[in-house]
Amino acid sequence: MFSPQSRLRHAVADTFAMVVYCSVVNMLIEIFLSGMTFEQSLSSRLVAIPVNILIAWPYGMYRDAIMRVARKASPASWVKNLADVLAYVTFQSPVYVAILLTVGADWHQITAAVSSNIVISMLMGAVYGYFLDYCRRLFKVSSYHQAKA
């Protein structure tokens, strides 16, 4: 069930990475940049956990596909970082739009929020990629080790 080749192991590693990373980073952003109280941010993060659980593994597979293309283009580390940013922004932005539509935001609010989120995502996408790689090593995901070799 949790063999190194297990899809479940891969899904658990990706889910762990997304829930932990998004909870910590977004809480810091909400409190220190957005001016939310600790309680407001905690509520926001608790609501976000189910969404993160649902999108973590699909995002991991999407990122892996983009990384394969990037690796074929160039082995340079800047290409990997650019691919991480591209994967993060192109996957997370539509998810964010859907969340904002669900909570009743208008198009003006959505445009402002998503634009800001894209800028932050451009800074955080590569960092999340490194954290995801670390979690996959921590969980001993074998396909990850084979892809890196």
Curated annotation (Swiss-Prot):
Signal sequence segment: none
Single GO MF descriptor: L-amino acid efflux transmembrane transporter activity
Name under which the protein is recorded: L-alanine exporter AlaE
Family membership noted in the UniProt record: Belongs to the AlaE exporter family.
Organism listed in the record: Citrobacter koseri (strain ATCC BAA-895 / CDC 4225-83 / SGSC4696)
Subcellular location: Cell inner membrane
Primary subcellular site in the record, as a coarse category: membrane
Domain of life according to the entry: Bacteria
Biological function: Exports L-alanine.
Membrane topology listed for this record: Multi-pass membrane protein
Gene Ontology terms: biological process: amino acid export across plasma membrane
Positions of transmembrane segments: 16-36, 46-66, 85-105, 112-132
One cellular-component annotation, GO: plasma membrane
Record keywords: Amino-acid transport, Cell inner membrane, Cell membrane, Membrane, Transmembrane, Transmembrane helix, Transport
